[in-house]
Each structure stands twice: as C-alpha cells, then as structure tokens.
Curated annotation (Swiss-Prot):
It catalyses: tRNA(Phe) + L-phenylalanine + ATP = L-phenylalanyl-tRNA(Phe) + AMP + diphosphate + H(+). It comes from Yersinia pestis bv. Antiqua (strain Antiqua). This is Phenylalanine--tRNA ligase alpha subunit. The gene is pheS. InterPro entries: aa-tRNA-synth_II, aa-tRNA-synth_II/BPL/LPL, Phe-tRNA-synth_IIc_asu, Phe-tRNA_ligase_II_N, Phe_tRNA_ligase_alpha1_bac, Phenylalanyl-tRNA_Synthase, tRNA-bd_arm. Binds 2 magnesium ions per tetramer. HAMAP family: Phe_tRNA_synth_alpha1 (MF_00281). Gene3D superfamilies: Bira Bifunctional Protein, Domain 2 (3.30.930.10). Belongs to the class-II aminoacyl-tRNA synthetase family. Phe-tRNA synthetase alpha subunit type 1 subfamily. Its main location: cytoplasm.
Length: 327
C-alpha cells in the first residue's frame, strides 16, 4: 500500500484546514466514514493473499489511528477557540461600580395595618378575615340594618344582584366569627371595603379595621380604656381624646371618637359602641349573659393623620416619589 502514507498526509492536511466543527466532521466522514478512504482500504484487504492480510490490516489500522488522533486534537482546539470567543464576548469589567440594590419599603397603609395588628395582638386579639363579595344578610341584616336603611341604597353600595354586593364594611366577618365561635371572642378584622364615593377624602375602595370583644361583664368603660390606650400608642403622644354620642345600627350606645389636632381642632378618627343586643341574638348569643363592644376605623384616614397627608388619593397613585418618603 504505497499510497497509504500519502492518504494519511492528505487527511492530516484536511484536518488542519478545517475551520469549524462542521467542516471537521466532513473530513472525518471522507476518510473514516462507512464509504471513506480508509474504510475502502480495509475492504480491499480481501484481494491480498491470506498471509499478507494481517500485516496490511495493521498498517491500515495504524493510519486510521493517526487520522483519528489528528481529528481529536483539532476538535479540541476548535472547541477551545469557540469557548474563548464566548468568554471574551461575556467579559465583565470588574473595575466598574456595582449596581445599587434598591430596597423596597412597605406602603404607608400597610405600615398602619401592621402597627395596629401588633398593638391589639399584644392584648390578645386574633386577626380574622372574610370574603369581599358578601351577601346582604352578613353585610346588613345580621347587623341590625333593615331593608329600608339608607346604607343599602344603590348609590352607596356596589351591588351585583339583589343579594350580592362588594362589602361596605368588614363587620360581616364579625358576624361569621360569632356564628362559628362561642364567647369569649376577641378579634380584629382588617380588609378592603367598597363604597360608591370618590373625592379628596373618599375612594371607592379603602381599608378598614374593625375590632370586637364579646364576653361577660364587658362595659363601655372597657371600650374607652382600650381605645384611649390604642390612640396614644398609635400617634405616640398623650393626645386629648373625646367620645361623642352617635348612632350606628349595630351598636347601642354608639360614639364617635375625636382627637385634638395640632391646629387646635377636633379630628374624627373612629366609630365605636356596645354591640347591639339584636346583633347578639342574630348569631345565637344571649345578650342577658354576654355583652361586647365593637369599633371601626379607616386605615387611610389614620395614615393621613399620622403622616400629615392631605389627599387620600395619593395612597393609590403608586407615585414612588410619594411612597419613598415612608421607608
């Protein structure tokens, strides 16, 4: 096989001339494939005398090994070049300053909710929640709000149909809790509520927090003491506080609570009262044995008063310049 050395030399030259993996694979097929030059050389061994075939076969195998080694070396070199090129393209300039990590912050209304939950949690109140799409029984009837009450008017409430609505207060959760639990009950209920109103101090959706205690021998004195402690803790000062007689269908007696502002004027902050006996009867609690008090407050309003915000709508506009002030 005098031309075998020449064939190997051509193969090695073709290997070195391959500029990528695809071209290199074509060289492999040309010389070592099923119909490649070296494969044909092995096939031609049958034409030799039997005694010459082993030696000739060994020479061809040696040639195949040389070509395969050349292929492997070239492939490794090409793959290394591809990797180096990719790394060069992805090079990071370690001398550049790092990107600043912007820390997020809680929304001011969320801060208010968490602050209130922490205070009442230390007094043994649990946090309850309920559906925002409510039925008229839990939102009105069970709370001593009859069908003719103005709060049920279409212009104040978002109704889906004759019995389904977006809840106007979180009081429905109080009803559900009293239906499911026996006294003593001590809960707060934060959540979104909906009313058909929109101006500088009202939005169609806002956050409310209600509280409820039902137990033996609960009095208005307990209510006043609890709310005095809460308001002074929340505003972090010894505020002047007053209770004004008011009316709510679900409490009797009822009151609204004001705090003295820095401008010397009274500011309303929440409503409260002793749970109406009819409400207790509606959930199967005997008002002759148990009594309770309830209170409710708007989270946005308390947040406005705490941080000096003048327009309620600012809480819902997602302006980072505004929100970053509360980090």
């Amino acid at each position: 096989m005098p031309h075998l050395a020449e064939l190997v030399a051509k193969a090695k030259a073709a290997v070195e001339g391959a500029q990528d993996i695809a071209a290199l694979d074509l060289v492999r097929v040309e010389y070592l494939g099923k119909k490649g030059h070296l494969t044909l050389q092995m096939t031609s061994l049958r034409e030799l005398p039997a005694e010459e075939r082993p030696a000739a076969g060994a020479v061809i195998n040696q040639a195949k090994q040389e070509i395969q080694e050349a292929l492997n070396a070239r492939k490794e070199k090409l793959e290394s070049a591809v990797l180096n090129a990719r790394l060069a393209a992805e090079t990071i300039d370690v001398s550049l300053p790092g990107r600043r990590m912007e820390n997020g912050g809680l929304h001011p209304v969320t801060r208010t909710i968490e602050r209130i939950e922490t205070f009442f949690g230390e007094l043994g109140f649990s946090v309850e929640s309920g559906p925002e799409i409510e039925d008229d029984y839990h939102n009105f009837d069970a709370l001593n709000i009859p069908a003719h009450h103005p709060a049920r008017a279409d212009h104040d409430t978002f109704w889906f149909d004759a019995t389904r609505l977006l809840r106007t207060q979180t009081s429905g959760v109080q009803i559900r809790t009293m239906q499911e639990q026996q006294p003593p009950i001590r809960i707060i209920v934060p959540g979104r509520v909906y009313r058909n109103d929109y101006d500088q101090t009202h939005t169609p959706m806002f956050h409310q927090m209600e509280g409820l205690i039902v137990d033996r021998d609960i009095s208005f004195t307990n209510l006043k003491g609890t709310l005095h402690d809460f308001l002074r803790n929340f505003f972090e000062e010894d505020l002047q506080i007053r209770f004004r007689p008011s009316y709510f269908p679900f409490t009797e007696p009822s009151a609204e609570v004001d705090v003295m502002g820095k401008n010397g004027k009274w500011l309303e902050v929440l409503g409260c009262g002793m749970v109406h006996p009819n409400v207790l009867r509606n959930v199967g609690i005997d008002p002759e044995i148990y009594s309770g008090f309830a209170f409710g407050m708007g989270m946005e309003r308390l947040t406005m008063l705490r941080y000096g915000v003048t327009d309620l709508r600012a809480f819902f506009e997602n302006d980072l310049r505004f929100l970053k002030q509360f980090k």
